[in-house]
Swiss-Prot record:
The keyword Ligase applies. Pfam families: RTC, RTC_insert. Catalyzes the conversion of 3'-phosphate to a 2',3'-cyclic phosphodiester at the end of RNA. The mechanism of action of the enzyme occurs in 3 steps: (A) adenylation of the enzyme by ATP; (B) transfer of adenylate to an RNA-N3'P to produce RNA-N3'PP5'A; (C) and attack of the adjacent 2'-hydroxyl on the 3'-phosphorus in the diester linkage to produce the cyclic end product. The biological role of this enzyme is unknown but it is likely to function in some aspects of cellular RNA processing. This is RNA 3'-terminal phosphate cyclase. It comes from the Archaea. Belongs to the RNA 3'-terminal cyclase family. Type 1 subfamily. InterPro entries: RNA3'-term_phos_cycl_insert, RNA3'_phos_cyclase_dom, RNA3'_phos_cyclase_dom_sf, RNA3'_term_phos_cyc, RNA3'_term_phos_cyc_type_1, RNA3'_term_phos_cycl-like_CS, RNA3'P_cycl/enolpyr_Trfase_a/b, RPTC_insert. The lineage of its organism: Archaea, Thermoproteota, Thermoprotei, Sulfolobales, Sulfolobaceae. ATP binds at residues 279-282. It comes from Metallosphaera sedula (strain ATCC 51363 / DSM 5348 / JCM 9185 / NBRC 15509 / TH2). It is found in: Cytoplasm. NCBIfam families: RNA_3prim_cycl (TIGR03399).
Length: 334
């Protein structure tokens, strides 16, 4: 059984999620101590506990320590179980982070997941980022899949719902040296259970920032009265690769400034010339379990560095990193 130190590096929930994903793929059990040791509320919170229970369900795993607040966990995967499953975080915990844990195991298996929780919440990728940036980048390495939004869930109420299914393909090596020439910018500006004009005003804020680019900017408005109150905007820039940026509505922040924030973040990412943004630079790492990866990223975050160390625990892999902002990463199976 592999020993994982949950306090090393960024010391957050990603260490656990990556360990769960890789354990389920490789069949290697692990014991993790110091779960989320560097967070204000260490130990398993509802979102992390849901990730554990999803992977336990999908692998018929033997698990101990899976309770709220637990700082130690043992996980020994068994046989993969296919089928359709529904899980509910019970809070506004991120459905995207739970999906990220399960998707690697779902590839080329008849597994679909309906996840209830937060679709657009702070400190995690909005579900539209998963749809507009994450999945299109997976397609570049030969993997397709679907994430459908059934209902939006914002902090603190939650109550959102997504369906994750159809992940399949023949994974191939991924090489992304640069972003290349910008062709277009797409996105979604959403508002739920609040005045509809907010979605349009968020787009206006984006257009103010991105007007310097002489490319089509197509941001859809999504207005719904079903789901917990909130707003947000996600952008995706398309060239040889795909970069993303996002912003969530907040009390006291105008809709225009929500849009400007997302536009400014995207502009900052694009100016690095890297192939992927700072979030995808981290999220892609786990997929070195399927193929060799070589790409440039806008910023080498502590999240990314920590994730690489978890990968090294489970896989025999050569790692080469050059630079920090931007950086170049090579992950090659031995």
């Amino acid at each position: 059984m592999l020993e994982i130190d949950g306090s090393f590096g960024e010391g957050g929930g990603q260490i656990l999620r990556s360990s769960l994903a890789l354990s389920s793929l490789t069949g290697k059990g692990f014991r993790i101590r110091g779960i989320r040791a560097k967070r204000k509320n260490p130990g398993l919170q509802p979102q992390h506990l849901t990730s554990v229970r999803v992977m336990k369900m999908l692998t018929n795993a033997r698990v101990s320590g899976d309770y709220l607040g637990s700082t130690e966990l043992e996980f020994e995967p068994g046989e993969v179980v296919e089928g359709s499953f529904t899980v509910d975080v019970g809070t506004a915990g991120s459905v995207s982070l739970i999906a990220m844990t399960a998707i690697p195991l779902m590839i080329n298996r008849r597994i679909s997941l309906r996840i209830r929780g937060g679709t657009d919440v702070p400190l995690s990728p909005p579900v539209d980022y998963m749809r507009l940036v994450f999945i299109p980048l997976l397609e570049k390495m030969g993997i397709t899949g679907k994430i459908e939004v059934k209902r939006r869930g914002h902090y603190p109420e939650g109550g959102g719902e997504v369906e994750v299914y159809g992940f399949r393909g023949e994974p191939r090596d991924l090489v992304l040296d640069s972003f290349g020439e910008l062709r277009e910018i797409t996105g979604v500006s959403h508002v739920t259970s609040l005045p509809a004009h907010i979605a349009k005003r968020q787009i206006q804020g984006v257009m103010e920032v991105l007007r310097e680019f002489n490319v089509p900017v197509k941001v859809e408005e999504e207005v719904s009265n079903e789901g917990s109150r909130g707003t947000g905007i996600v952008l995706s820039a398309h060239g040889l690769s795909i970069m993303g940026a996002s912003s969530l509505g907040e009390k006291g922040i105008t809709a225009e400034n929500v849009g400007r924030k997302a536009g400014t973040e995207l502009l900052k990412e694009l100016k690095t010339g890297a192939a992927v943004d700072s979030h995808m630079g981290d999220m892609l790492v786990t997929f070195s379990a399927f193929a060799n990866l070589e790409y440039t990223g806008s910023l080498l975050t502590q999240h990314t560095e920590t994730n690489i160390e978890v990968i090294r625990k489970f896989l025999e892999i050569d790692v080469k990193i050059e630079g920090r902002s931007p950086f170049k990463l090579r992950l090659k199976r031995k």
